[in-house]
Amino acid sequence: MKKVLLLLFIIPFAQFQSQWIEKAPENPEEFVNPLIGTLSKPSLSNGNTYPAVSVPHGMNLWTPQTGKNGNGWQYTYDADKIRGIKQTHQPSPWMNDYGMFSIMPITGKMRFNEDERASWFSHKSEVSKPYYYSVYLADHNVTAELTPTERAAQMRLTYPDSEDSWFVIDAFDKGSSIKIIPSENKIVGYSTRYSRGKLTNFKNYFVIYTDKPFTKYSTWKDKDFVKDALEITGDHCGAVVGFATKKGEKVNLRIASSFISLEQAELNLQRELGKDSFDQTLNKAKLAWNDKLKRVEVAGGTIDQMRTFYSSLYRMLCFPHKMYEIDQNGKIVHYSPYSGKTEAGYRFAGTGFWDTFRALYPFLNLVYPSINVEMQKGLINDYKEGGWLPEWSSPSYSDIMIGNNSASVVADAYVKGLRGYDIETLYEALLHGANNEGPQATGRLGIEYYKKLGYVPYDVKINENAARTLEYAYDDFAIAQLGKALGKPESEWGEYYKRSQNFQKMIDPETKLARGRNHDGNFQTPFNPFKWGDAFTEGNSWHYTWSVFQDIEGLAKLMGGRKEFSKNLDKIFELPPIYDDSYYGSTIHEIQEMVNANMGQYAHGNQPAQHIIYLYNYSGEPWKTQYWVRETMNLLYQPTPDGYCGDEDNGQTSAWYIFSALGFYSVTPATDQYVLGAPLFKNAKIHLENGKTIEIKADNNSNENRYVNSLKFNGKKYSKNWLSHSELMKGATLKFDMTSQPNKERGTDEKDFPYSYSTDKK
């Protein structure tokens, strides 16, 4: 009988997981699972995410904290205890956090140590939404809830019957301050902690109000309570406030913060919370997500596909986060990490362009251009105040990763039609960054070699040299595209088109692969195409050879033509997932993720490889793109805590899924084109900000019918392997006829291939 009951339970559950959703949801925010990717650790990333509670691009995010203070893995799904509910600005565990503080309700003995206050919890009593978080803290018999605004939040703490109910405020170490004001039921303070870059006069000020007077309280510093001191400043400060509560009594906290001042934090609180109840704030946050997520409607897929889709779209809208605030005069202002002062205008932080130039920013330009206009204005302020465009902003320049990919982010926005900001200053900033070495991964390391030789040599003690050269060449292409679009003299932008061909100097004619090259012109010897790092960045030659976004046709010629090009693409999936990790001295997590994926040398868990699948469109075999796109979505994305196949990286890995599920991808930002794949859903609608709609239909789509038999664009037969951004922006209907067998006639003519600089007729 027990076996029968078990089967009865399993079968409906399995049916539910594969249930088809035929209608686009009215509440897509309810399909979001913020816990996707949280089952991660330094040695293996399944996303390296945390369950961010925020509004789209909010200045602050919130998360339950399971990791110790200072641990970049601030929430992991396999943890047993929660140490606090934390305000965070952390874009990645590898970047760590800045300006954080936490709040933790407790009962019983007055205490503050993070280990002593921690409580067991269960995922069965945890609710995680983009706009709301709730958890039952078993050791304290307290339920903690939180809902956010852009710069504020409300917490609702439900206590048991206790004479000793408390909450702990932890302002973290490396410089903090706290002040208890009992007469106003108020605690204020600041945190100065940060992890990356150089920050001037940095503080995150916070203010907390309770609706219940606290009758007992104490500040604390480092490891001890501080008697008779309502205000304390030091390395690691905090407070504990308490009161008696009845069973089920709810204590409400109203919280806000500012990077500018306590007065601005108070203003943020009054402006964003006003007199709203917890539930009113929750409903506003829910509506904010609903508005953004419903810009893209999908239907005709399984419930798991819907969950993965909207969870990915949510991740794309968390970062970069706003660093600007609105002052008492209604003016937009921001704390500048460069001057340490309050400056006018927009500013954003929490993104690395090495990751996000590929798909995240192109998707913003298509669906959410107005927020990217603000971001472009923010980049202008970065340049004016700091002297450089950031490549990794957290919240200032961060000395990590390679490339000069701000060029792509700026150029793609303008080429895709974004206007209303000072593009001339941004163009000036790109030229400056393209020709100079800057601090903390800005500008171009090795630029003098690059300008003289056309590449960064392998033997001049500049690491990741081949990868740098390939990325600089693409970035030069982006600058040329922008200069041309701005009507600059050809003598100016023409030079950058020439530099964009420097990729040719990195392709070894013997192996047909990218390879480090010495100062004297000889290629690196010995050479192992499976060796990670060294001449490349978090990858090997099989991954980086294809980073010629601007001229895939030119790359194919160097490989001996399109047939050889396709054969080399095939090898990526046919070769075993072998590797040489000697450069690192151990197996870094990106290597392990490639091995675990079991797709040969294809390393989707890291960004340099994510466009590779789409390159079959350039060699007349688009059906292989269609096959591998669906395989990747099926195998490497799930709506579960281990749902990603590597670092999610601030929306980029999610953006690949969103684009691919819609049927196209941005292989070459800074052009007008997207490269075709095949849609995942039977129906999709993209509601553009200009009021137009892109409708994507694939009535006979299924897991078996993953190949494109034919395509109609606005009712007319369409054979090209690419779509025009400018045409899509007019509104469009794409009708795919899907089949279980590849159509090896469609998209095979050279005239149907996507853009390559070598074949550009303009």
Model-derived features: where do they sit?
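Accessory carbohydrate-recognition regions in carbohydrate-active enzymes
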Residues: W20-Y361, N365-S408, Y414-L470, A478-K505, ...
